[in-house]
């Protein structure tokens, strides 16, 4: 979910940049269609 994603980003980046992922790729944000574009998008796909 988005809370877990925010926590993960905080641990890796040391700051909250989760808002930059809301419209990233095909699956980061709400819903999604098509093939995931990269590893980050695949992570969003798995958690959707």
From Swiss-Prot:
Monomer. GO terms for biological process: arachidonate secretion; lipid catabolic process; negative regulation of T cell proliferation; phospholipid metabolic process. Keywords: Calcium, Disulfide bond, Hemostasis impairing toxin, Hydrolase, Lipid degradation, Lipid metabolism, Metal-binding, Platelet aggregation inhibiting toxin, Secreted, Toxin. Optimum pH is 7.0-8.5. Activity decreases rapidly at basic or acidic pH and is virtually absent at pH 12 and pH 3.5, respectively. It comes from Bothrops pauloensis (Neuwied's lancehead). It catalyses: a 1,2-diacyl-sn-glycero-3-phosphocholine + H2O = a 1-acyl-sn-glycero-3-phosphocholine + a fatty acid + H(+). On the 2D-gel the determined pI of this protein is: 4.3, its MW is: 15.8 kDa. PANTHER family: PHOSPHOLIPASE A2 FAMILY MEMBER (PTHR11716), PHOSPHOLIPASE A2, MEMBRANE ASSOCIATED (PTHR11716:SF9). Its cofactor is Ca(2+). It is found in: Secreted. Ca(2+) binds at residues 27, 29, 31, 48. GO terms for cellular component: extracellular region. GO terms for molecular function: calcium ion binding; calcium-dependent phospholipase A2 activity; phospholipid binding; toxin activity. This is Acidic phospholipase A2. Its main location: secreted. Binds 1 Ca(2+) ion. The active site is at 47. Expressed by the venom gland. SMART domains: PA2c.
């Amino acid at each position: 979910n988005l809370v877990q994603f925010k926590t993960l980003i905080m641990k890796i980046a040391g700051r909250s940049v989760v808002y930059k992922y809301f419209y990233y790729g095909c699956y980061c944000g709400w819903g999604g269609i098509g093939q995931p574009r990269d590893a980050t998008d695949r992570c969003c796909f798995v958690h959707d």
